[in-house]
Amino acid sequence: MRNLIVCLVLLTGLVRTAFADEQKPAAKPLDVKSTFRNICGFCHENYGRKAAKGPQLMNSERSDEFMFNRIKNGMPGRMAAFGSAFTDDQIRDIVKFIRNLKPDQEPQNP
């Protein structure tokens, strides 16, 4: 009887653990403007409108796919990879933010 109770307690714990991942709340939307200022802004000044350690990003001729891959995978010796810091959807939002930059307007979150 004691073994049965121990097994039931362990089984209950395993079931609760298995379903715990499914009950996580949705990720909070990324504040792209603040993220860009605090992380990307070190190398891409004025929200990417001015070249610094990194290139100017506003009006870039690079494709969205190129920008996505560069943000996600980086470039050894030139840019850190941020694929482990952001989800793919968040990286897409960063690319949208860059695409919407205007020289004379305050940047907006996508």
Please describe what each predicted stretch is.
Residues P29-K33, F42-R78:
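Gly/Gly-Pro-rich "capping" loops immediately C-terminal to redox-active cysteine motifs
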Residues A26, E61, A85-F86:
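Short, conserved sequence motifs enriched in acidic/basic residues, glycine, and aromatics
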Residues V6-G13:
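Bacterial N-terminal signal peptides
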Residues L14-T35, Q108-N109:
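Electrostatic cytochrome c docking/interface patches
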Residues M1-L4:
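Positively charged n-region of N-terminal signal peptides that target proteins for export
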Residues T35, G74, A85, D89:
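Residue-level signal for short amphipathic helical patches enriched in basic/charged
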Residues N38:
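Cys/His-enriched microdomains
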Residues S84-P110:
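C-terminal capping alpha-helices of c-type cytochrome domains
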